[in-house]
Amino acid sequence: MHRVPNPSYPTTRHLLRSLACAAASVLLSTAAMADTWPNKPIKVIVNFPAGGAADQIARAVTQPLQAALGQPVVVENRGGAGGNIGGEAVAKSPADGYTLLMSSGGMVSVNPHLYPKMPFDPVKDLTPVAAAARVLVFLEVRPSLPVNTIQEFLAHLKANPGKLSFGTPGNGSSPHLAAEMLKTQANVFAVHVPYRGAAPAMQDLLGGQLDFMFDPGIGLSHVKAGKLRLLAVGSAKRSPLFPDVPTLDEVGLKGFDADTWFGFYAPAGTPPDVVTRLNREINKVLGTQAVKDRITALGGVPAPMSPTDFNARASIDSARFGALIKARNIQGD
């Protein structure tokens, strides 16, 4: 018996045609977005308070970036929870290229190890856009501390277990991890005082409420003014700003490297053409002398690279710092 097709049910061919049209529509709309982007102001959320390294780098880059993109680029600070508050805000924003995150690389390489119940997955919910800078960490002490060299400082720490305190921008922050590296490799103990950002910690170091700090670069002007004493660099190489200051590796803490990477991220699903344009323009800005000078003044080195290379850097740090966090039983805020 011949069955007459029911016109109310689409055939397989019709379904495939509809799906193809839908896919083409998505591709066309994405391409159209990339062609017209940006046509309104762009917001960059910094997930640490104003005055810190992330904030200063963001402002150094976004100021000239405005001219390159032809739209205002507005910086907004949303600190707290180790950067997770600002990170979540960006991860849950529309993936249209108009909301970006400026963060240390710890957002994707450290926080997943610190916060097992994060409200978002930074690896899956954020896409790397561009690295901005590699910032060295500087071991600084209050001038009244009775030490003048890194060797004297380490001896003083060993002779006074638990009597010295150090400040950090928060539990699991890069300066905190640097201090935990120091405690592990030098076999010393000091009291950790976490803050909401590097700037308030620096103020208490200047005020004498803290004994030492791994500074991500915001206190170098105080070092030059004699208000803080710089003893060592917690990086693989000496700083060009202070070529006479040794690295911790040089004084016996072999392999010590706690550099902090900063960069820009976008919500996952942001059109690839938009990410490519942002990466290209940010890398151009990083090559200008004015931005180089501002990043160098922070104790950093401009780090232009592709999103793929930036992501690979985060993977390396994730393995390295993840092991430290587990060994030291470090907990997030």
What kind of region is each of these model predictions?
Residues 101-104, 168, 232, 296:
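Short beta-strand segments
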